[in-house]
Amino acid sequence: MQIARTLIASVVAGLMATSAMAMTDAEHKAAKEKISADYKAAKTTCDALKANAKDICMKEAKGAEDVAKAELEAQYKPSDKATNKARMARADADYAVAKEKCDDLTGNAKDVCVKDAKAAHTTAKENAKVAKAAAKPADSAAEKGAQVAEARKDATAEKNEANYKAAKERCDAMSGDAKSKCVDDAKRMYGQS
């Protein structure tokens, strides 16, 4: 599992080291081959594991590959769309791994884990949308500020809803007045009605 993180770090470091220069077709092809080789090596490492640990390792390896490919494309053909795609790939990879880690749990603990993973995924996706709005050109500073403010407002609403669902799931472990108070506190904390 640590290998996937090391893989991501080395690929990102390699990509950042050459990010100031334009990437040639040969460099792009070599980087793609390295990503593929790193993924195969990570998969081989995962094959030694058993049960859910193997599943988690495979999700980490696949996520690392997807993120590295998206970041490579963002570097090879820089654009706001490619950068956003890389952010989304990172969010999706983290979500897949977090969800897979929940499989070791049972009952309410598993439900809470899945809701927490979903909340983290929603947060990452909404942050990517805000960054996309901030990078989008506008006719004036006021217009750009309004676009970013609207994106932040929408993102906050989505994040609060996801966090509320996770908090509410935690409350399901309780009963009676304690559960009612817990749900009311969660509603108040995340602005839900």
Predicted regions and their residues:
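Short helix-onset patch at the extreme N-terminus, typifying the N->h transition
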Residues: 7-8
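Mitochondrial intermembrane space
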Residues: 3-4, 14, 18-193
